[in-house]
Structure formats: C-alpha cells, structure tokens
C-alpha cells in the first residue's frame, strides 16, 4: 500500500512521521510539505496526483493559527476547507482512501460531556468554520 502524508512539517505530521519511522515501515510512505504540494493551488494538487499514485492519503496539513484566521479568512478557508474538498475528489477519482484530521474547534465548547464524531458542529470562530 502506497501512502502519502500531507503536512510533514506541522506538529501532527511530524508526530505521525516519527511513529512510522520508529516502526521502520516508512518504505511505502511519502511525506510532503508545502514545498512539494501547495494546497493553495488546485492545479498543483491535480498535477501532483496525476504524476503520483497512492492508495491512502493522510491529510495532516492545516492552517492552524487560530487568531490570525480571523484576518486571513480566505487563506484559512483554502487550506482547511477547499483543499480538503479537492483532496476528496482526487481520492475518489484515484480510488484512494482519505484520512482528514479535524479539530475540536468545530464545536462551541458548551457541552459538559466529551464530544463525539456524530455530534452537531457549532464553530464559534473562523478557524473552526473552515475546518
């Protein structure tokens, strides 16, 4: 199985890469960052996946500056929302699986119980809305 992890330079991407490296199973993994795959450019996404085949796409990339997302709404939306939609279409076209990591910011924080994946979202800021 060929696996690509997008977002290798972020906190989550580095953590996943460290786990894969420790298990010595990285021979089927490709780790890419912004330099290799710019998620702000749909044509770049298409071009990359037209030249590379993967069975599994793990998206750890994200615009994570919560406060700055209020000012850079378009960029946050492009990376956290529109690029994910594009990756989903690419995965479907290539018959690959897609794992996308979200955030608890999609919830408003008012629940007294831990949130479940099936709970209704209610983001309270731009960052949460883009995720």
Predicted region positions:
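Conserved catalytic-site region of short-chain dehydrogenase/reductase
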Residues: 101-114, 126-127
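N-terminal Rossmann NAD(P)H-binding glycine-rich loop of SDR-like oxidoreductase domains
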Residues: 2-22
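Active-site Tyr-X1-5-Lys
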Residues: 122-131
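SDR active-site strand-loop-helix element
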Residues: 6, 32, 57-61, 98-103
